[in-house]
């Protein structure tokens, strides 16, 4: 028989809330996600480098 553990309630409640995800447009998790730099710039890919200079001028360099 299954022993009910009261400490599991928070996790169970969280799982029950998954269907009401506030971000329904979120795509399924990619089983092979590309490397993502931790710089809060999700639009970057491995062919794009962006430098931000102290004068706030944005230089976009695209490496072919």
From Swiss-Prot:
Domain of life: Eukaryota
Ranges of compositional bias, category Polar residues: 1-14
Stretch list, region Disordered: 1-42
Protein name: Putative uncharacterized protein DDB_G0267946
């Amino acid at each position: 028989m299954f022993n009910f553990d009261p400490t599991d309630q928070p996790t169970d409640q969280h799982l029950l809330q998954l269907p009401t995800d506030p971000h329904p447009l979120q795509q399924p998790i990619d089983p092979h996600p590309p490397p993502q730099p931790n710089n809060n710039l999700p639009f970057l890919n491995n062919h794009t480098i962006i430098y931000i200079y102290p004068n706030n001028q944005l230089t976009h360099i695209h490496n072919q």
